[in-house]
Amino acid sequence: MLCLPVFIILLLLASPAAPKSLETRIQNDLIRAGLTDADLKTEKGFLSGLLNVAGSVCCKVDTSCCSSQ
């Protein structure tokens, strides 16, 4: 009868320390990969927008840089 409370306490202590399941780790990896992809797309869009602004400023100042347009 004394073993039952000790067993229950040990179960409660051991359950939070259980390793994550494979499914949870895969979900975390997919979420992290999605965020990384979103950051790359945002950065690429930001850089292309910055280049467009620089190109338009260059065309206003000197027409030789926008001969391709």
UniProtKB/Swiss-Prot annotation:
InterPro entries, per database record: T-conotoxin (IPR031565)
Gene Ontology cellular component terms for the protein in this record: extracellular region
Keyword terms, alphabetized: Disulfide bond, Neurotoxin, Secreted, Signal, Toxin
Post-translation changes: Contains 2 disulfide bonds that can be either 'C1-C3, C2-C4' or 'C1-C4, C2-C3', since these disulfide connectivities have been observed for conotoxins with cysteine framework V (for examples, see AC P0DQQ7 and AC P81755).
Keyword Metal-binding attached: no
Range of residues in the leader sequence: 1-19
Tissues expressed in: Expressed by the venom duct.
Positions of the propeptide segment: 20-54
Predominant subcellular localization, coarse grouping: secreted
Cellular location(s): Secreted
The keyword Secreted belongs to this UniProt entry's keyword annotation: yes
The family this protein is said to belong to: Belongs to the conotoxin T superfamily.
Domain-related comment: The cysteine framework is V (CC-CC).
Entry protein name: Conotoxin Lt5.10
Organism: Conus litteratus (Lettered cone)
